[in-house]
């Protein structure tokens, strides 16, 4: 075990580790969202819900960092470069390559793979919001207040039945 980090799983056969510093960032992201951004933008929720939403956002942030690092790792593996581990830490993540890329083109492709995954993930998220036909704030509002969505749908159903009769 690497000092100050813990293995949390494997992806592509590569050990995924979380460094102790990750927990500091997790707490800072969660607390800043729960005590600042979320109450200001989604008023009226319980404190527990703000903290839960902040924690989910922090986990998703680090999930995106992990996918970014897996992008680097995947391309490195296509060049038969072994990856000893991926570590998530305070400044993001790092894919530990056991050797240097064989040529500049391979090095460039490995380097650009992580940002390409991040751009693709961002486009996927924007596309999902666009396909849902609502802005990000509206989507967050629906996630935060699902009972209001259900009530509106029930009301619409009631009105529709009365109009048909």
Identify what each model region corresponds to.
Residues 12, 91-92, 113, 121, ...:
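Short glycine-rich loop/turn motifs that provide flexible caps or phosphate-binding loops at active sites
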Residues 1-32, 36-38, 43-44, 50-108, ...:
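Small-residue-rich helix-interface/hinge motifs
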Residues 137-165:
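N-terminal low-complexity segments that are often proline-rich with Ser/Thr-Pro
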């Amino acid at each position: 075990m690497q000092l100050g980090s813990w293995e949390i799983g494997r992806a592509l056969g590569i050990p995924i580790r979380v460094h102790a510093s990750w927990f500091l960032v997790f707490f800072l992201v969660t607390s800043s969202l729960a005590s600042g951004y979320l109450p200001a933008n989604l008023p009226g929720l319980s404190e527990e819900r703000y903290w839960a939403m902040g924690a989910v956002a922090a986990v998703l942030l680090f999930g995106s960092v992990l996918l970014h690092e897996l992008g680097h790792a995947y391309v490195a593996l296509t060049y038969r470069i072994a990856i000893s581990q991926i570590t998530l830490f305070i400044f993001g993540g790092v894919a530990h390559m056991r050797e240097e890329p064989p040529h500049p083109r391979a090095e460039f492709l490995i380097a650009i793979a992580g940002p390409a995954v991040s751009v693709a993930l961002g486009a996927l998220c924007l596309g999902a919001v666009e396909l849902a036909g609502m802005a990000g704030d509206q989507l967050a509002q629906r996630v935060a207040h699902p009972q209001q969505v259900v009530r509106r749908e029930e009301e619409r159903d009631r009105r529709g039945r009365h109009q048909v009769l």
